[in-house]
Structure formats: C-alpha cells, structure tokens
C-alpha cells in the first residue's frame, strides 16, 4: 500500500488534532462532577463509562495522522493503567497540556530536544516531591478513603476495605457479576483450588454433598495411584492413628479408588481423594505450595521418592479440609511459618520479573492462596449497562487501593500536583531547557483546572486560589468547599499520580521531537455500483 508522509509543522499539527479530540472526550469524565461517555459496541447495548482507558482504547479516528496522535494518548492511558490500575484520565489531561504548550513553543522556533530535556528534569523533580509528601496507608479507613474516591461510592470503599482486611494486602480480590441487584462480598479463607472429590461416596455431609475432614493427614504426589498395594503400608499406619486422610494425586483410578471408597463406606477410615490442581510445571509449583502450607513432602520422582516407601512423617496436615464436587479448601495448614514466608517472597519475586499478564495473574492467585485467602466482590445492578459501568468503577478502585498500599497516598483532586509546582519552579536552566520546565509547571495545574470546569466553575480562578492555600488544602468539587484533603478523605495513591505524570511526560516529549509522520495513503473508493437496468420504471 502506498504511504503518505507529512513533515514538521504539518505533521505535528495533524497529530495535535488527534490528541485534542481524544483528550477532550476523556477529560470530561474527571472529578466528582465529571460526565459519562457512551461507547457504541459492535453488538449488544452501548457501554456507558467514565473510565479513561476504556474510552481511549475504543476510539479510532478516520484521519490516519490524527489517529496516530490519539493512539499515543491511548498509549499513555494504557501504560498508566498497567502500572497503577487507575489515573488514566489524569494522565490524558497532563499529556494534552504538555503537548499543547510544547507545540506552541516548537512552532515559535524552540528546539524540541532542549524542551524534552526540560520536561524530563521537571518531571523528576515533581515525582521526588510527590514521594516526600506521601502518607503511608496505616488503617482500614485509609484504604476505604482511597477506594471511595476512585469509585465515587462510599459503599464500594467500605467493601474493598473489608476485603483487604480479611485476605491481607497481598490477597486475591476478584470481581464477579452477581445474579441480583446488590453488591456483596464473599471471602474464602485458607487455600482453595478447583478440584473436587473423585467419588461422591466420599462425602461426609449428604445434605451439602461435601466432605469435611478435621485435622487430616495430607498425602501429596504427582504420581497416578492405580495399585492400592503401593500405599497400603501408609494407610495401615493412618488407620492405627484414627485420623482422616486427604489424597492429592495426579489421579486415583484402577483398583485403588474402589478400595478406598469401600473402606470409607465400611467406616474403616475417612478418606477423600482429589486430583492435583493445574497442569505441567504449574501443577508442580502448586503441589509445592500446598506442601509448604501443610508441612508435607511431595512424593515425586524428581526427589527420588516412591509411594511404597512413604511414611507418616512425609505427610502434611491441616486444621480442617472441606471438599465439594468442584473445590477443595485447606484451612489452618500446619506448615512452618518461616518456610511459608520464604515461599511467599519467592512468588513475589517471580511476579515482579514476569512479562506475561497470564503468568502474573496465576502467580498472584498462588500468592493469595498462601497468604490467607481469596475475596470475591459480587457486583449487582438493575441493568446490564449499569453493571458494566459499576464493574469498571470497582476495578479502578481496587487497583487504586493496591497502589496506595504499595507507595502511600497524597492529597487528591489534583492538589498534590499543584503543591509540587514550587519544587519544579526552583529548577534553573537556560534557554529551551527552561522552556520545557515551564511547560510542565503549567501542565501540573491542568487536572485541578479541568475538575473545576467539570463542576461548572472557572478553572483558572480555582487554580490561583489553590496556590494561596497551605499545602494539603484543596478544592472539594463535590461540595464546592476548601478543605484539608487528607482529613476529608479526598486522596489519590502516590503511585497513580506519579505514573500519570511520568507516562504523560514521556510520550509528550517524544511527540514534540517528531519531525515526520508516515501513514497509509487512503485508497480512492472504486465505483463498482451496477448501472440501472433500463425498462425498470425507475425502481432502483
């Protein structure tokens, strides 16, 4: 396909139009009085959202050059979302402000490379200042405040705070759709994996169709148990001690399964067999997680261990195990606390090093199961459209909360960005580098200005008043009052604010140093319409 090339001012102005079109759409959603955006779907009802990254990803412009500008803004939103999980609208607003000011100066003859250097210096100074003013998350109420602001809903804030209190900061919190209209929280304590009993005759509670084992031994192996003779000596030792047994193996079949069932029915001893969770290398890792949690040794050829030689000392144990048709839950594993902590750190390291989103998700699930449990927020709503919108809000709030736990929080509502302007203004450089610093200084005001304008006020007036206030005091656009933002519970995670600024500055600087843009040349539409057939009386 033929290409079309635009240079210098012509190229930058086209891309700037794309930046403005997308940013103007996204920035209408910022703040407590921000509006929603309706997105057309290829099928089903439209999506109504105020989530910046969702809007950015759904936007494609007709003009190829404008679309490239829009896609660069979309990249800022996506990157911020990947790192911090929230702050995508703030990142978009900052990008537009830096690009617009920068373009004016480049058009007037400033050197874009010098401007880029100034933007980088100013961004570093601002980020350092944000870290200095950051507050550590110390209580459940801090978590609730962060989540409430992000979701614009106090109930959601309390729900997320409850979830994090129950499963810990490293715990897995998943979001599912509820069948009703209410939003609720379910917590699964202990380690749960999606494998159920191999025979329904192993249940101990016929009403609930589940097997409850109190203080059981746990046999872990990656082998298939087909011959009962392989485990007979071990079973005899367990029968003598009168304790139940949970077998987690690659599979239990052949004569072994009916023999175990028969002994269970006769009351010889209480036993439940389940298949090991996962597949391949992930199965080995999960078996080792269970072994660490319960104090067991995995009977595997990798360690040169055989089932026939297994002793009671190689078994794990737990306070309680519940097995249903679909899930197995191990509570109060008897593993060594130091070894569990060591295993947790090992998984955290793997999470930080992996580049695959799928692997990261699976590692986080394993981490949560070792750390104490899984919480499920079941989102309810009256309509499907409202349900989607509410899910987006809760996902953002959850991500923001995790970010706050990680790096702390700063005064919200754009206040922190205005508060760091002093540190940026203290930088003294020459020429175009100083111009770049001034561009960032001006851009830091933009989120507050936009929040005020979305609330129907004059943004510049609010910004000037904010500069007169003491640090930490900001404008509450929901009530039109000046308050101490932290005391009022209006806070943003430091990681979210930092990531928004860094990503906006990075892409903006690249855009300003662009000298040529190459795009596909649109092909002329071929006129393949069939000519009207004569004699049809004009019925075309």
UniProtKB/Swiss-Prot annotation:
Which residue ranges are recorded for the region named Disordered?
A: 520-540
Q: Write out the residues that bind ATP.
A: 29-32, 86-90, 413, 476-478, 492
Q: Which domain of life is it from?
A: Bacteria
- Any one biological process term the GO annotation gives: protein refolding
> What name does this protein carry?
Chaperonin GroEL
Q: Which family does it belong to?
A: Belongs to the chaperonin (HSP60) family.
Q: Which PROSITE patterns match?
A: CHAPERONINS_CPN60 (PS00296)
Instruction: From the UniProt record, list the reaction(s) this protein catalyses.
Output: ATP + H2O + a folded polypeptide = ADP + phosphate + an unfolded polypeptide
Q: Write down the PANTHER family for this protein, in alphabetical order.
A: 60 KDA HEAT SHOCK PROTEIN, MITOCHONDRIAL
Instruction: Look up and give the organism this protein is from.
Output: Ligilactobacillus salivarius (strain UCC118)
A Pfam family assignment: Cpn60_TCP1
Task: Give Gene Ontology CC terms.
Answer: cytoplasm
Alphabetized GO MF terms: ATP binding; ATP-dependent protein folding chaperone; isomerase activity; unfolded protein binding
Subunit structure comment from the entry: Forms a cylinder of 14 subunits composed of two heptameric rings stacked back-to-back. Interacts with the co-chaperonin GroES.
Q: Which UniProt keywords apply?
A: ATP-binding, Chaperone, Cytoplasm, Isomerase, Nucleotide-binding
EC number of the protein: 5.6.1.7
Q: Predominant location of this chain? A: cytoplasm
Q: What does this protein do?
A: Together with its co-chaperonin GroES, plays an essential role in assisting protein folding. The GroEL-GroES system forms a nano-cage that allows encapsulation of the non-native substrate proteins and provides a physical environment optimized to promote and accelerate protein folding.
- Where in the cell is the protein located? Cytoplasm
Q: Which CDD domains match?
A: GroEL
